[in-house]
Amino acid sequence: MIHKFEPFEFFKINKVPIDSVLDIGAHKGKWTQEFKKHYPDVKSLMIEANADHIDDLIRTGHYILALLGKDNEEVDYYMCEDKNNTEGNGVYKENTNVPFKVTRRKCTTLDSLLPGQKFDLIKMDVQGSELDIIQGSPGFIHQAKYLWLELQPHNYNIGAPSAGKVIGYLNQIGFEIVTIDEINVGNGVIMGMDMIFVNIRNKNLKTGYDINKKVIWNGYAS
């Protein structure tokens, strides 16, 4: 069961300026399409590892086919054998009953793929590789105002860093949680959640949000 929240309320209330977004793990481009409904003039770039989705990506906007990670190296890449169920493809194999086959793929870092570029918001939905990508290009990440990440408290992808580990690392480098997009629950357990983080360390960024702003309550619920 997926519990949806209203992340764009945060952006609207705080009048957050977003001029550019990077959609990593774009799949068929649906996230970018939804984001553009709220920020129609935003400049977007999608990165997707699966070439099967090129036709969908072309209809959405600019894209690059690439597999991102912590280093420039070859890695095992797991592909779902069911072509209609490709959202689980990635470096960390799903801990499910779904059959996957493994191939070898060239992996690259954000710094190597997009040298000198920066984006106001970076979204990642990469089956447990979020922390690898962040650690592989810390300077690139430091230039982002916001990170929109899929995280996994449950061991959904074998060997992938847990949500707690990712959140702890982000706190160390100056990113704090501000809101939630969705929580995916199965058998009473949180399988995954999409969380949004603000960069509070890079003072040169105009995030539109003051994490220390006093909260004004109109009243407490009884």
Predicted regions and their residues:
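Phosphate/nucleotide-binding beta-alpha loop and adjacent structural elements of enzyme active sites
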Residues: 1-222
